[in-house]
Amino acid sequence: MYNPYQQQQAAYNPQQQQTGFAGGFNQQQQYVQPQQTGYYNPNQPPSLPNQATGFYQPQQQGMFNASSFQNQPTGFAQQPSIQPQQTGYVQTQPTGFQQPGTNSAPTVTENSELKIPSMRLSFITAADQSKFEHLFRTAVPKGEQAISGDSARDILLRSGLQPITLAEIWSLADTNKSGSLLFPEFALALHLCNLSLKGDPLPTMLPEKWSNEVKSFVDAISFSVPENPANILSNTPFASSGASSNPINNDWMAPQATGFNNSGAVPSTSFQAQPTGFGASQEMMAQRTGNPPLPQQATGFGSNNVAPLLPQRTGGGTLIPLQPQQTSNLIPAQKTGPLQPQTTGFQTQNPHQTGPGALQPQSTGFAQRMNNGPLQAQTTGFQQQTTGFQPQSTGFQPQSTGFQPQSTGFQPQQTGPLQAQPTGKPGQWGFVSTPTGGIPGMNAMEQHFLPSSQLPTNNLQNAMGGSLKTNVTWSITKQEKQIYDGVFSAWDSRNKGFIDGEVAINIFGKSGLARPDLESIWNLADTNNRGKLNKDEFAVAMHLVYRRLNGFDLPLRLPPELVPPSTKHIQDSMDTLKNSLKSGSAKSSPPVKPGKTDGKRYKNDDSNFGYVSNVRHRKKNVSNNDSSNGDEKPSHNSDLTIADLKKLVREKKILLDAVDAEDQDAAISNRQMESRNYQEIDSLKQQIRKIQSQLNDNVSSSGSIGERKQLMDKLNYLTRDKVPGLISKIHQVNKDIATSKVELFKLKLSKENPDWQPEDAEAGIVGTGVNGEVTDADRQKFKSKQLLKQRMAALTGKSHGSGNELDVKLHQEIKNTRSEGEIQSGMINDIEASIKDLEDGCAANLQVTNKEEVGTDKWENGNNLNEEVAKFVRELNSSKPKQQSSSQVNSTLSQGQPQTQPQSNNVEAGIVSPQVTGASDSSTASHEYRTPEERSAYIKAQAEKRMNERLAKLGLTRHMTSGSSSTIEQQTQNKTTSLYANSETSKNAERKLESQPEYQQQQQQQQQQQPPPPQRQQSQQEAQLQDKGTNGQPDSPRQVGQKPTEIMDNESDDDNEEYVALMKKKEEMEARERKRKLKKKQDKEARLEKLKREMEELKKKEEAGDSSDDEEPITEVASYGPSGSASKSSTTKSIEQPIVEEKTNEEQIAAPVVEADTFVPKTHDNNPFARIQNNSSTPGSNNGSKDNLFFKPEKEVKLDPKKAAAQRASQRGLGDFNDWSDEEENSSEDEGPNRAGAAQLASLLFGGMSQPVPKSSTVTPNQEFHDAEDIPHFDSQESKENNNGEYTSQPTSVIQEKPDAIDSTSEAQVKSIPVEVEAPSPDNFTPPPPPPPSNIPPLPNTSAPPPPPPPPPPMDTPPIPSSSAPPPPPPPPGAAPPLPNASVPPPPRGAPPLPGDSSLSSGTKQAPPSGGNVDIGALLGQIKTGSSLKKVDENEKRIADGAVVGRVL
């Protein structure tokens, strides 16, 4: 057989030999090359890799039909070209060998009948294994499974290796020692030859992995079932049926089709398709046992014997699902009627018989319904079902006779459940019930994976998951198995019983899963690596796809629940055979025990019982043995001589001595071990004591578990109990404040307009929303209409109802109040979030884990330990120093704070209040904590610092506990800010501090000139500052410049760091200020242009109008006299407006005592808007500050020419109306001083005295816009009034009293830095002049820059009162402040107005203290004199905007 190879050795050149077996022998390949390239043209050596890839499908096809193997080797029909060789070996195999003479090379026949499992050997590449397989098939004759020794020798000798080497390779490859090699052994031998040719040494022993793979491969070949039908039918009742089958079909299942004698070709064709699906040898047995009902039907009709029913019925319990599939195919064939004569033979049979005649009761139904053709055919189908039910439910047989007419309708219903039942007995694989509630997406699975389905993958993925995802189990449920079997049947149209890899790619590709997932699923399902899936394996793969679509991970190996029963049975059989072979042959096996062990005899094992009587079951041989043993012992002892006995005694003594010596040695070694252990224990104790002493010297800062728990409980109490309550209270207070503001504004409007009745906000609005609801658009539209009416009334000169205007004002106030409340609520929420962050940070450090708690309880307290170890732990605890409790530490810290106060050498020592310094020192001391209490104090200080930083980012500062703590804190911050903003280095700050004695002397002089009530006020302020020094310590990190732990460092470094921080903050504030001013300037310019147009129209109209309108305000002079209601209203306003700014600046020294105790300004102390306002516009920050870069107004000087023009226009009687604020809406053009009449001016002074900012003839629109530039934009009506009062009032009385002194001292005072704690004003404050009389509330400070000096006033100006006049006595409680001389222009001056001045001093000198008797004539004369002025200084124009102007006693 191999001579052609030897003859053709010389016909091939070495290059052809090398390329032909590239994976094999590298040196000498001429022995193997002709065998593999004999099919091809020698000029085409690259075709061999294509041959290797084609060897897998012939193996798969060969398992279906033997004829396909004969056609496979002929796939080289077109060998002269390269392309047919590459593709033809896979695709053109069935047409091979038809033209064998196309190539002149000798033909080599390949044994295509040889069955080699498609298993991979990991130590050989796939190309090499395919080449080895081809060589093996050509060398093995047909009908054999192994290559003989001679053939293997001839092949191996072609490698050119030494015979000794080949002998070693043979010993390693022939694992069974049979003298022949199976394919895995042959491949191993060739692989070893390759290793030897490469120069690698041969292993003396096969690696375990190689050996296991080869043995498994050999087992797979050995246990493969032969494909011969004769061998399969042998020793079975189907042998006779197989002999009579049609030889053309070549199918052993054809006898079943012959049972239908007259049925024609329809049943036979249906059976022909089924056997082709079970062509594999392993699956044919399953089909044979799975189709027993068909032979029962065929033999039941008289054409065959009953004998074949016996094995078919007993074997039908393995694969029942095929029965309903076949019956459904046979029902239309049975309806044709040829089966009627067959049923007559069963008329007399008993329907209740069992055994081989189980078909008889089913066939009795045919005798009763012979005339009904369709019913007879249906009942035959039902027979198959009942036979399938016999092994499962025997109780169904008696019911079948009575329900035969009904059961014909139940046929499709019964075939359904039968599909899931044959997968196993209850409790086995595939028989799990569906969970309650079902599993998701099963209907979508069934519809999506059918061949005709073209649905997108999104539909399938959307159907998965959901709440039912948790019901998906590892096992395959009945419902799933039915669906998967239906999908399998739909794709297996040829009934092959398998689904190939290409079809599986199309099926599983519809799932939309990634390729790695599909590869893993295929590897798990195709356990035998056959490249195809049967029905059970397909169900496993579909179930894995289903689980993956539901989001579950794929397992690394197949779980036991998903292993198919067929695979289990085969694997169990293989394991059993392997174990029997491993245990050895029959020679080494133990002798078989007597007695039968078959199932016909049951043998009880009495040894299972605990007690068995000695008398029972006593065997004779046992008694004989006992008696013989008893006789032997004395005979054996009696046979010993005395010498032997002595020898035994001596030996025993020697053994006993040896045992004693061993015991003694063991005792000595134990004592030595104990001594060493004690020494080691002592040394460890000494080390532990040393470490404990070190720990005692350096107290741990972490604190004990108990202290941490205590602090954690306190933290939880504060953050979970206190803070939420405080936050809710703050929100409630904000709501109350908003409500109170609205009510207060309503009361103000009511006082100003007694006839006005507030209307409902929604009364005049027509709602366009749902159900007539009023929407925001409706409100905006209504407001626009009202404003339009007002404008039209102003243009036409007609009077407009003031009630609507007041309602609009009220609505605007409500809206502003709501927006302000929302902003404050947002800030409070931010503070709450910051508190939450701080709580999380503290909780992370204070939380105690269970592990720490248990370890502390064990090793710190000595619990649950050995007594000796616990004693040692207590000894260590006794050496620990006693720690102070948290209360003691807090007390010591609080006591240490005043002591550390004088040690501060910081530049801010003279500026920051005592409580600030103490807090900073305490925070520094807390950095050097030695106890847990100190650590907790340090944590609190750090938390406060972080809180202050967060608030600073929001533009807020921390509150003090006392009433005016926020102003002191803010002014302290302003001091530090202005200090470092005005000085480039700390030396400049020191030079500024040197000027403090002058300032102190000035303060002393001023205090000496003050009356007693302001001194009492000053003492109260000192007491408040002292209280704040004790209560305001938690805010110290913010006040000290946010340096809680840096005092120990170099002070110059501290100053530089703080200077950088302050400069950065200054730049941010300047940027915000510039942005705000730019926006306001744009708005003002637009309003100003609009106002100018209106003024021009009004001017033209007034020039053309009659003089009757000018006489109207004169009649109102008498009605606006100094009445009681007017004085009461003015008194109320004088108390409410000035005090708001009195509290914010620290110039309260000049305020009366009665008004200092008023609680009204506290609303602005707690208002974040007020704090923002103070930072940008309070007198403490920008009143008269030439050197302050934060709030220095630079753009306001540019408006001076326009202001002068506007002033002259106002003096000529032009209107003052604009839409800048709500206060200005109260006065229309008709009410303004548009005619410059003295009576009209007086009516404005006394009639509009309840308004906070009355517009007199001395105020121009330009001036108002200029003033508004310094005012932050707020929505609150009250804040607008206060701000206008601040920024538009200019104190002039001091200038009138001592103009020269002020000019000389103002510059020096601006440069000086206040140090006194009693007057903690910013460094850019100028010292206040001598205070006005105590009964006049001081005006708030202004921030207007010095304008150019105005022209000298006319000579008819009233004389300025002398500043040396003694102040009048303080008025009684409740008295209103005296009437000021509001419109008297002061003499020219060059210095800016001083803060804290009262513009009413001149007025107070002239007005009587009791109030009420005012010289109206003199006042009107002054007003007339002022109205005739041509130009007024900018600062004097603001007199009319003062908060107390127009107030009547």
UniProtKB/Swiss-Prot annotation:
Residues 1325-1395 have a biased composition (Pro residues). Residues 1048-1058, 1105-1114, 1219-1231 have a biased composition (Acidic residues). Pfam families: DUF1720, EH. It comes from the Eukaryota. Keywords: Actin-binding, Cell membrane, Coiled coil, Cytoplasm, Cytoskeleton, Endocytosis, Endosome, Membrane, Repeat. SMART domains: EFh (SM00054), EH (SM00027). Component of the PAN1 actin cytoskeleton-regulatory complex required for the internalization of endosomes during actin-coupled endocytosis. The complex links the site of endocytosis to the cell membrane-associated actin cytoskeleton. Mediates uptake of external molecules and vacuolar degradation of plasma membrane proteins. Plays a role in the proper organization of the cell membrane-associated actin cytoskeleton and promotes its destabilization. Belongs to the PAN1 family. Component of the PAN1 actin cytoskeleton-regulatory complex. This is Actin cytoskeleton-regulatory complex protein PAN1. It comes from Debaryomyces hansenii (strain ATCC 36239 / CBS 767 / BCRC 21394 / JCM 1990 / NBRC 0083 / IGC 2968) (Yeast). The lineage of its organism: Eukaryota, Fungi, Dikarya, Ascomycota, Saccharomycotina. The gene is PAN1.
